[in-house]
A protein has these predicted regions:
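Positively charged n-region of N-terminal signal peptides that target proteins for export
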Residues: 1-6
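Beta-strand-enriched cores of mature, soluble protein domains
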Residues: 24-170
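Bacterial N-terminal signal peptides
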Residues: 7-18
Length: 170
């Protein structure tokens, strides 16, 4: 074989192998669990006719466990900021709680916690659904969801546990 054919063939196979490796890592996905520990910094309620609107602001930490890789390092922790808003009527409640999680590198994960059952006072809690909605850095484009359970403790402390969170990056 001529030297040019060897060079061209080698270059082709190198590019092909490189492309295949990139394609294999482009569609990353996995599972993880997390625990959040949140301290409520402020809470306010406004009554309006047949319903009450409640806003809760808090800060805390999130720790990832049972991770099978990707951007969620097993045992790693990050800080979080959260704003919850709740509409409460005699028929129940509707809670939506967006949060921003920042890891040590400065990358941010955006999450929204939603639930329509349970309570939000000390000793209360309930179950809902956590949605992962992208972020910055290693979390950019990431989506996913999982069930969670929240417990409101004395002193404005809140504990959230989520298991079986499925996530993927396109």
């Amino acid at each position: 074989m001529s030297p040019w054919k060897v060079i061209i063939t080698s270059a082709f196979f190198t590019l092909f192998a490189s492309f295949n490796q990139q394609a294999a890592t482009a569609g990353e996905k996995g599972t993880m669990d997390f625990v959040q520990s949140i301290l409520i910094a402020n809470q306010m309620a406004i009554e309006q006719g047949d319903h009450k609107m409640i806003a809760i602001v808090g800060n805390g930490t999130i720790t990832f466990s049972n991770s099978d890789g990707g951007p969620f390092t097993e045992g790693s922790s990050a800080t979080l900021s959260v704003i919850a808003y709740i509409k409460q009527t005699e028929n129940g409640m509707n809670l939506e709680s967006p949060m921003s999680v920042s890891d040590a590198s400065g990358d941010k994960l955006f999450m929204v916690m939603r639930r329509s059952t349970g309570t939000f006072d000390s000793g209360g809690g309930g179950q809902g659904r956590a949605e992962l909605g992208g972020g910055t850095g290693k979390f950019a484009g990431l989506t996913g969801s999982c069930p969670y359970e929240v417990n409101f403790l004395d002193g404005g402390n809140v504990v959230v546990r989520a298991t079986g969170c499925s996530w993927e990056k396109p």
